[in-house]
Amino acid sequence: MGNNQSIIERLVSWDESISFEAKRVSGKMVRKALETIVAFANTKGGILVLGMEDYSKAKGTDRLIGIQENAEAVDELQQKIQHKIIPPIPIDDVLWKKLNCILHDGNSGEIVIISVPMSPKVHSIVEDGTWKRLEKGNREMTAAEINELCFSRGVISAESELVDVPFELLNTDSWRSYCENRGINSGDIKDRMFRIGLARKKDNLILPTKAAVLCFAEDPSGILSSKDSVRVFHYAGTRIEHGAVPNLLKKPKTISGPLIKQITNAYEYVINEIAKGLTIATSGFETVHRYPTRVIREAITNAVIHRDYHITRDVHIRIFDNRIEVESPGLFPGNITTETIAYAGSFSRNPLIVNCLREFPEPPNIDAGEGVRMMFAAMQAQGLYPPFYSSRRDSVVIFLLNEERPPVWEQVSEWINRNGFITNGQLCRIATVDTLKASKMLRKWVELEMLEVDMSKGKKNARYRKAGSEADGNVIGLLSGLSDNKKSPLL
């Protein structure tokens, strides 16, 4: 009961947000709750509490109305979750938990917590549309928004689109090397690509897929009138300086060609740039780049292979004195997030491209879903910080830091993963340091863009969370308290 009380105290203090909503089980609750559940699944996940008044109408324990107000509505919602959502949200993915509590009138009662994960799919309600979550409330999505979300989640991929490109433009050295390695000898290029799924019929014509153009054309960007190359920027110092004289060490390098060559050439170019010996950092100290080469290769490979080719933008690699950044167009596919990337299973946005590149004589470093884990292990073995991922509006950036990792970081990282944020006082207790030392540590992590600070509650109450984090810190902490008590929807 003590743990329940702690959870309830947190719940009643929360206002509605992109990841949280509370509802009384009366009136039109079932329809609105179903919309919220679908909206959470289609956005970032979230928590819906039944039997609790809205924050704008009551405060504290006065919000605890209880589900006995309309218990039948809760049963109806359970049924509709299973039968009115398409495609269905797996029943085991939705966590339901009843909590006993003292209601606003002093009587004993129950509320229900429903935890909905971010889904790898895009869900709709039968005869009630497709919904997304806003900062407060839900909104029905337009057809264009649904299409964009399908591309973003990897439900559909631009690689499978048919393009009106002559097959002779794909009959390159890369194509011949690929065919020789696979033992594909019979038929012309059109027939061969059709047989292996890299071309399909449309109106009695056989056309190549975008994947075929990306994998074999000498200049995919030119042929597709798109931006499907890799660009490398090498900066002096630790940040981009905007001004009359940019702090680029040299002209940006554009690397184009078939994807297999983009990966190889970009990797070799970056390795050559960081292997030129010592560089003078802006601090005046000499620095040596210590990144494991396997990690750099994997970061580039992932950016090229798993990017969203629906977005017209190149992959950007930025080299600084203290880090390498690789920015890949498109968000994480499926339900992978910055919080789960280190241990999430593989989810390929572009299976045609992945399968194609595996069949080259010297395939890129595709480790059957283990590449990200390898990166974390290799950076740890080198004594460096683990890779950091940040989600931006329509891209994902991986940061490889050329910085020695202090032992306390593992505890700090785990604390933030469980609670969503950390404060100066909490770091003092974890690291057994004074306030000044904790402030210096936090300030450095912010400068390295590993953490970002929230001062909305004042400087003394500053909270730090991982940069580019996609989850609501409040929800993270609550979910960690519920995860050991998971119950099915059939309460």
Feature map (PLM): residue ranges:
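Short, cationic-aromatic polyanion-contact patches
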Residues: 456-479
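Short alpha-helical "packing" element that flanks the helix-turn-helix/winged-helix DNA-binding module
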Residues: 408-412
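Conserved N-box helix within the HATPase_c
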Residues: 295
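Conserved N-terminal catalytic/coupling substructures associated with nucleotide/phosphate chemistry
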Residues: 1-292, 300-404, 417, 423-428, ...
